[in-house]
Protein backbone atom coordinates (compact mmCIF):
# COMPACT_ATOMS: atom_id res chain seq x y z
CA UNK A 1 0.00 0.00 0.00
CA UNK A 2 1.52 3.32 -1.11
CA UNK A 3 1.66 6.19 1.33
CA UNK A 4 0.08 9.49 0.42
CA UNK A 5 2.68 12.12 -0.49
CA UNK A 6 3.57 14.37 2.42
CA UNK A 7 2.82 17.98 1.64
CA UNK A 8 4.95 20.69 3.15
CA UNK A 9 2.82 22.95 5.31
CA UNK A 10 3.04 26.61 4.53
CA UNK A 11 4.20 28.37 7.64
CA UNK A 12 1.69 31.06 8.54
CA UNK A 13 3.24 34.18 10.05
CA UNK A 14 1.16 35.88 12.69
CA UNK A 15 0.50 39.55 12.08
CA UNK A 16 1.77 41.83 14.85
CA UNK A 17 1.13 45.57 14.75
CA UNK A 18 3.18 46.60 17.80
CA UNK A 19 6.59 45.26 18.72
CA UNK A 20 9.38 45.81 21.21
CA UNK A 21 13.00 46.27 20.11
CA UNK A 22 15.50 45.15 22.73
CA UNK A 23 18.96 46.64 22.10
CA UNK A 24 21.87 45.26 24.11
CA UNK A 25 24.82 47.57 23.45
CA UNK A 26 27.96 46.32 25.16
CA UNK A 27 31.47 47.66 24.58
CA UNK A 28 32.29 44.66 22.37
CA UNK A 29 29.08 43.94 20.42
CA UNK A 30 25.49 45.07 19.80
CA UNK A 31 22.54 42.65 19.86
CA UNK A 32 19.17 43.74 18.44
CA UNK A 33 16.09 41.59 19.13
CA UNK A 34 12.55 42.47 18.07
CA UNK A 35 9.76 40.78 20.02
CA UNK A 36 6.00 41.03 20.27
CA UNK A 37 4.35 42.59 23.32
CA UNK A 38 4.49 39.27 25.21
CA UNK A 39 8.24 38.95 24.69
CA UNK A 40 8.23 36.22 22.01
CA UNK A 41 11.22 36.83 19.73
CA UNK A 42 10.31 37.54 16.10
CA UNK A 43 13.81 38.26 14.79
CA UNK A 44 17.29 39.21 15.91
CA UNK A 45 20.68 40.28 14.57
CA UNK A 46 24.10 41.09 15.98
CA UNK A 47 27.00 43.22 14.85
CA UNK A 48 29.27 40.16 14.89
CA UNK A 49 26.78 38.11 12.88
CA UNK A 50 26.56 40.90 10.31
CA UNK A 51 30.14 40.28 9.22
CA UNK A 52 32.04 42.58 11.56
CA UNK A 53 34.91 41.09 13.54
CA UNK A 54 37.31 42.35 16.15
CA UNK A 55 37.35 46.05 16.95
CA UNK A 56 35.04 46.86 13.99
CA UNK A 57 32.30 44.89 15.75
CA UNK A 58 32.09 47.53 18.47
CA UNK A 59 31.37 50.51 16.20
CA UNK A 60 28.16 52.49 15.71
CA UNK A 61 28.12 51.52 12.02
CA UNK A 62 28.16 47.80 12.88
CA UNK A 63 25.22 48.37 15.24
CA UNK A 64 23.38 50.23 12.47
CA UNK A 65 23.87 47.33 10.04
CA UNK A 66 22.66 44.87 12.69
CA UNK A 67 19.51 46.96 13.24
CA UNK A 68 18.83 47.07 9.49
CA UNK A 69 19.20 43.28 9.21
CA UNK A 70 16.91 42.74 12.19
CA UNK A 71 14.31 45.09 10.68
CA UNK A 72 14.48 43.15 7.41
CA UNK A 73 13.95 39.87 9.29
CA UNK A 74 10.69 41.02 10.92
CA UNK A 75 9.14 42.92 7.97
CA UNK A 76 6.89 39.95 7.16
CA UNK A 77 5.15 40.25 10.54
CA UNK A 78 3.69 43.63 9.60
CA UNK A 79 5.07 45.55 12.57
CA UNK A 80 4.39 49.27 12.34
CA UNK A 81 5.05 50.62 15.85
CA UNK A 82 8.11 49.85 17.94
CA UNK A 83 8.86 50.44 21.58
CA UNK A 84 12.63 50.51 22.13
CA UNK A 85 14.41 49.18 25.24
CA UNK A 86 18.11 50.09 25.33
CA UNK A 87 20.45 48.25 27.67
CA UNK A 88 24.17 48.84 28.13
CA UNK A 89 26.76 51.59 27.64
CA UNK A 90 28.05 50.61 24.19
CA UNK A 91 28.73 52.77 21.15
CA UNK A 92 25.75 51.37 19.23
CA UNK A 93 22.98 52.77 21.40
CA UNK A 94 21.96 55.79 19.36
CA UNK A 95 22.77 54.55 15.85
CA UNK A 96 20.61 51.46 16.36
CA UNK A 97 17.55 53.55 17.24
CA UNK A 98 18.17 55.81 14.22
CA UNK A 99 18.49 52.79 11.92
CA UNK A 100 15.21 51.29 13.18
CA UNK A 101 13.50 54.63 12.59
CA UNK A 102 14.94 54.83 9.07
CA UNK A 103 13.75 51.27 8.36
CA UNK A 104 10.16 52.49 8.46
CA UNK A 105 9.11 51.75 12.03
CA UNK A 106 7.28 54.37 14.09
CA UNK A 107 9.12 54.53 17.40
CA UNK A 108 6.61 55.18 20.16
CA UNK A 109 8.81 54.99 23.25
CA UNK A 110 12.52 54.76 24.10
CA UNK A 111 13.38 53.35 27.51
CA UNK A 112 16.81 52.88 29.10
CA UNK A 113 16.79 49.58 30.99
CA UNK A 114 20.51 49.43 31.79
CA UNK A 115 20.93 47.50 35.05
CA UNK A 116 22.49 49.70 37.73
CA UNK A 117 23.88 47.94 40.81
CA UNK A 118 23.05 49.22 44.28
CA UNK A 119 26.70 48.60 45.19
CA UNK A 120 26.69 44.97 44.08
CA UNK A 121 29.69 43.16 42.59
CA UNK A 122 33.15 44.68 42.61
CA UNK A 123 33.96 46.06 39.15
CA UNK A 124 36.97 44.74 37.21
CA UNK A 125 40.27 46.48 37.89
CA UNK A 126 41.36 49.29 35.58
CA UNK A 127 43.34 48.40 32.46
CA UNK A 128 47.04 49.15 32.40
CA UNK A 129 48.28 49.36 28.83
Curated annotation (Swiss-Prot):
Keywords: Ribonucleoprotein, Ribosomal protein, RNA-binding, rRNA-binding. InterPro entries: Ribosomal_uS11, Ribosomal_uS11_bac-type, Ribosomal_uS11_CS, Ribosomal_uS11_sf. The keyword Ribonucleoprotein applies. Gene3D superfamilies: Ribosomal protein S11. GO terms for biological process: translation. GO terms for cellular component: ribonucleoprotein complex; ribosome. One of its GO terms (molecular function) is structural constituent of ribosome. SUPFAM superfamilies: Translational machinery components (SSF53137). Located on the platform of the 30S subunit, it bridges several disparate RNA helices of the 16S rRNA. Forms part of the Shine-Dalgarno cleft in the 70S ribosome. Belongs to the universal ribosomal protein uS11 family. Part of the 30S ribosomal subunit. Interacts with proteins S7 and S18. Binds to IF-3. HAMAP family: Ribosomal_uS11 (MF_01310). This is Small ribosomal subunit protein uS11. It comes from Enterobacter sp. (strain 638). The gene is rpsK.
Amino acid sequence: MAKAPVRARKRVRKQVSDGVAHIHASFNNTIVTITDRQGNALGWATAGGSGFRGSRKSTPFAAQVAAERCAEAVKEYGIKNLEVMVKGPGPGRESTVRALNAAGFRITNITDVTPIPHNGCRPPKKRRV
